[in-house]
Amino acid sequence: MSKIIKYITTISLLLMFNIFSFADNETEQILCLAKNIYHEARGEENEGKIAVSNVVINRVNSNNFPNDICSVVYQRNQITYIDKILKIFPIPAFCQFSWTCDLKPNDSFYDYKSWESSQRISKAVFEGLHNDITDGATHYFNPDKVSTPAWAKELQKTKVIGKHHFYK
């Protein structure tokens, strides 16, 4: 009996840490987009969540970024910090979206209603049911959470939707 429990526990841990996946590529792409919507725009209305997902899709369609959703979401090249308040202890992994570099489990979806909404919006955006409301933005930031990034001076602001400022 203990061997069965050990086996089930091992399989559960492998699934939890995404060591292997039974999802097809389309499902995986939708899930990556949903995770990004949840972590980047959890407190936003649907319009803000759609806008954040539009940026990911705009990046996928750009020659300057990877060509699939998961690669865009987990792309590394922006710095993050262990202590986000004092901006000390930089982490050498650079992240496009800060939640992908947070030193905590990033799949803890404690706000179930927002997670459900993020999944629904992700699927609809993936299927092309929502037009781009950001005017082609490939970047955004929330000034309540971070200082104005250096790249904002070099890009054109397209919209302010919810708490996020969008640029291309």
Role assignments for model-derived ranges:
Residues 24-168:
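Bacterial extracytoplasmic/cell-wall-associated proteins, especially those involved in peptidoglycan
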Residues 2-23:
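Classical Sec-dependent N-terminal signal peptides that target proteins to the secretory pathway
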